[in-house]
Swiss-Prot record:
Protein name: Phosphoheptose isomerase
Binding residue positions for Zn(2+): H74, E78, Q188, H196
Involved pathway(s): Carbohydrate biosynthesis; D-glycero-D-manno-heptose 7-phosphate biosynthesis; D-glycero-alpha-D-manno-heptose 7-phosphate and D-glycero-beta-D-manno-heptose 7-phosphate from sedoheptulose 7-phosphate: step 1/1
Native source organism of the sequence: Pelodictyon phaeoclathratiforme (strain DSM 5477 / BU-1)
Keywords from the named record: Carbohydrate metabolism, Cytoplasm, Isomerase, Metal-binding, Zinc
Subcellular location: Cytoplasm
PROSITE patterns: SIS
Primary localization: cytoplasm
Residues binding substrate, per UniProt: N65, G66, G67, E78, N109, D110, S135, T136, S137, S140, Q188
Length: 211
């Protein structure tokens, strides 16, 4: 049985809950606005890199842990299957490296978890491809190792980070750091929005919808 906090749920409590809703959603919106105003040029540059890679016959690999793994899978699916139903286009080659549980568990067991994504980059990545790493802290060693390996393979690298960028700051060719620390949730909300904007821009740059 799940027990509540034991507090009453009168009008005052409901008002406080509503304040939580407002505070949370308004802060999230303000953080996104700040990120957009400070990083619009970086987002456009990332989109150009992705669009150019697709034009050259390359692909995008994505990796992250936990909620960032879910974001990687979310964005890879929208590239390969569809982003908006109003845009008709062919599939765009993108692979989230967190989807194969057999590969993840074998890699964790045989190589150590920190080596898992780098091993998958070795398997799927080719010179000229892109690796997009997501980390709300910037300190995910498995993503750091994957970015390092990708660069050694001649791949281009992108990073969506949070806080102060952590250990991943400066590792990627292009990076965007969401300036929020202490919790992953607000950073993840920005990351998925940035991902959606990237896909929108890529579709426009490739001529599948109008600018």
């Amino acid at each position: 049985m799940i027990k509540g906090c034991g507090c009453s749920d009168g009008l005052t409590d409901r008002t406080r809950y509503e304040e939580v809703v407002l505070d949370t959603m308004l802060y999230s919106a303000q953080l996104k606005e700040r990120v957009a105003r400070q990083n619009s040029a970086v987002i456009v540059a990332m989109a150009r890199m992705i669009a150019g890679t697709f034009e050259d016959g390359g692909k995008v690999l994505l990796c992250g842990n936990g909620g960032s793994a879910a974001d990687a899978q979310h964005l890879a699916t929208e590239l390969t299957i569809r982003y908006r139903s109003s845009v008709e286009r062919p599939a765009l080659p993108a692979i989230a490296l967190s989807t194969d549980t057999s590969a993840l568990t074998a890699g964790a067991n045989d190589l150590g978890y920190d080596a898992v994504f780098a091993r998958l980059v070795e398997a799927y990545g080719r010179e000229g491809d892109i690796l997009l790493g997501l980390s709300t802290s910037g300190n995910s060693q498995s993503v750091i190792n994957a970015l390092d390996f990708a660069r050694q393979q001649g791949m281009k690298t992108l990073a969506l980070l949070g806080g102060n960028g952590g250990l991943m700051k400066g590792l990627a060719d292009l990076e965007l750091i969401v300036p929020h620390s202490g919790s992953a949730d607000r950073v993840q909300e920005c990351h998925i929005t940035i991902g959606h904007v990237l896909i929108d821009l890529v579709e426009r740059m490739l001529g599948y919808c109008r600018l």
